[in-house]
């Protein structure tokens, strides 16, 4: 991003366990900066849940538009378009807001040599988690209990079905 025109870049130095944690740290950091638009990818490379943008918006109490593939900003308003089943949905929203990008929002730009060299002079601020002032505390992270396997019965074995429903499932 620095090589194609961004003025500054920030990286929050974490190894997250969940999209919720990523969203919390992004929102805590963003609250310390001036912004009009918080732009995220449709899916994150860490968890692919397509949920980080929505959680950032919720933590910051901002409007959220997902899967945006067209964006026009005019003053304090933005017009957003996104593909939906059967057509295109167009929305208007006031700045600031959170947006998750879909394919087609921007053309990929390959940086030229001058941009790459200039990027080396621009700062990449690495933010330590303890400097964010976040109230996030991971108490526990555990997997759900393992479910029992599926039992296959012959179509005509009603006696076995009734026995399982009565003795194991306890529904009859």
Q: What residues fall within each predicted segment?
A:
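N-terminal glycine-rich FAD/FM-binding segment characteristic of electron-transfer flavoproteins
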Residues: 1-172
